[in-house]
């Protein structure tokens, strides 16, 4: 299984983090199998970070093999969606970026990719206009809509040329 993640895909979040609002290509990174946390299991803040941030995300499950997928056919390669949380050890990420080093470990640590229960796209609605939010202790702390993504799910699928069935994105 591969967990393919897309960073800096929302202009508002990029502005908050002082990143460029103009990207020519999505920022793609991988998460390891051990990053996956599901079935309502608890998340524990890792010992190596004192500044863990969360980002609510839409997660799409790839269900077909494909290569060199045309954008107009990309929707045929995924059929389920859920909400996820992408945890980031922000202090570690900032330190690694400042040194010009890869920062993937700050996002790909154990249990850093929380996912909910997948539902069929037919029940979820248009993947390009899905609202989502995160509540903590009854208070809404994040909300978004896939219509605000800089790169659509279909566009991202074009870059992922050899998906394995059951991959999550």
Regions inferred by a protein language model and the residue ranges of each:
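Single conserved hydrophobic/aromatic residue that forms the stacking wall/gate
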Residues: 163-169
